[in-house]
Amino acid sequence: MLDIKWIRENADVLDSALAKRGAGPLSASLIALDERRRTILQSLQDMQSRRNAASKEIGAAMAQKNSELADRLKAEVAELKTTLPAAEEESRRIEAELTDALSRIPNAPLDDVPVGADESANVVTRVVGAKPTWNHKPLEHFEIGEALGLMDFEGAARIAGSRFTILKGQLARLERALGQFMLDLHTGEHGYIEVQPPLLVRDDAMYGTGQLPKFTDDLFRTTDGRWLIPTAEVPLTNMVREQILDGEKLPLRFTALTPCFRSEAGSAGRDTRGMLRQHQFNKVELVSITDAESALDEHERMTACAEEVLKRLGLHYRVMTLCTGDMGFSARKTYDLEVWLPGQDAYREISSCSVCGDFQGRRMNARYRGKEEKGTKFAHTLNGSGVALGRALIAVIENYLNEDGSITVPDALIAYMGGLRRIEKAA
């Protein structure tokens, strides 16, 4: 959430940032709403001060045996007590209205983010590796998985409906191996602390990371009012909500492998075959909590950590800097890692790494205190996929396909597969 004080002082900057995201200007309406809030609050405070002062004056008047003055003061206090509740309610209402308006404004992009309306304006930052070449025809992952008898979409549909998958045998083991490999890499070499967080969270957790109030259609809600997490970013980032952190101990780096749940409400007709876009999928998430000065360097580091997964798996990929119209709601800058899928003859997103400034820290009321500083500042947050298991599995299946239809196990995963080097058709 953006700071209303910053908006008052940078109205043109906000409207320019919103224009870059394809939205209209909002600074004037927000500032007007804030002026109303401040006027009402000042009036309320004046009434409260007068009530308190009049109450004290009653005692003084009675001590002086000035009953007429005491009676007038009592009448004034009684009237204030009658009108104060309405004024307090109006103050709460306008405060809630302003907070709601602020909570729906996306984060302001950094100056070096390319401006554009959609993914067509994203910029290739770097390309790593080369596209594989074979003599045999590339196939899509679902063709390979079904031919091996290890991927069952029809069975999943009978159980749960569309956009679910059943993995069996060595493909199920391969996805598990991918997750173990990623966690070992991030905890053993990259300095992240592994966490097993809740998969169900409350409204305020979703609000803190920016999923609420705008994106309810993308989420699954339980009958008791909790939410299934769309990403482990939500519980990992909210681990520091309503805390004051020691700035000397930052950054904090967390990682988790969790199921993620998304309704894909806006994806009708897209990627309907296979497991590219699922209601339920597994993902390794990376989250960093840091200070303002270190956030941009931490963004580059986090992206490099996610890239290392793809490098060790021997996968060709590119890094994209997302344009203003394609970035997520809470992000100030985002790098997407897009892995090459031969079966689709296309690059597809496998990781998204974002720096969010203090946008989420403000929503969560997460602060830090520096050693030499007075007071506190809102924490800066970052999140990234390290990486999505389902899409990593797809990439391995398509890039390591052999002419006979078997799949070679990448060297980095052989130990996690119990020494197995090739996945073949189920007996």
Curated annotation (Swiss-Prot):
Q: What's its EC?
A: 6.1.1.11
* Catalyzed reaction equations: tRNA(Ser) + L-serine + ATP = L-seryl-tRNA(Ser) + AMP + diphosphate + H(+); tRNA(Sec) + L-serine + ATP = L-seryl-tRNA(Sec) + AMP + diphosphate + H(+)
Q: Which of this chain's residues are annotated to bind L-serine?
A: 231-233, 285, 385
* This protein's record includes keyword Protein transport: no
- Binding residues for ATP: 262-264, 349-352
Which CDD domains is this protein grouped with? Answer: SerRS_core
Q: What is its main location?
A: cytoplasm
- Source organism, top-level taxon: Bacteria
Localization per record: Cytoplasm
Q: Which BP terms from GO are recorded?
A: selenocysteine biosynthetic process; seryl-tRNA aminoacylation
User: Which keywords fit this entry according to its UniProt record?
Assistant: Aminoacyl-tRNA synthetase, ATP-binding, Cytoplasm, Ligase, Nucleotide-binding, Protein biosynthesis
Name one matching Pfam family.
Answer: Seryl_tRNA_N
Which molecular function GO terms apply here?
A: ATP binding; serine-tRNA ligase activity
What Gene Ontology cellular component terms go with this record? cytoplasm
**Recorded metabolic or biological pathway in which this protein acts:** Aminoacyl-tRNA biosynthesis; selenocysteinyl-tRNA(Sec) biosynthesis; L-seryl-tRNA(Sec) from L-serine and tRNA(Sec): step 1/1
Summarize subunit and interaction data from the UniProt record for this chain.
Homodimer. The tRNA molecule binds across the dimer.
Family stated for the protein in its record: Belongs to the class-II aminoacyl-tRNA synthetase family. Type-1 seryl-tRNA synthetase subfamily.
**How does the entry describe the domains?**
Consists of two distinct domains, a catalytic core and a N-terminal extension that is involved in tRNA binding.
The record's annotation in NCBIfam families points to: serS (TIGR00414)
What does the record give as the function of this protein? Catalyzes the attachment of serine to tRNA(Ser). Is also able to aminoacylate tRNA(Sec) with serine, to form the misacylated tRNA L-seryl-tRNA(Sec), which will be further converted into selenocysteinyl-tRNA(Sec).
- Identify this protein by name: Serine--tRNA ligase
Source species taxonomy: Bacteria, Pseudomonadati, Pseudomonadota, Alphaproteobacteria, Hyphomicrobiales
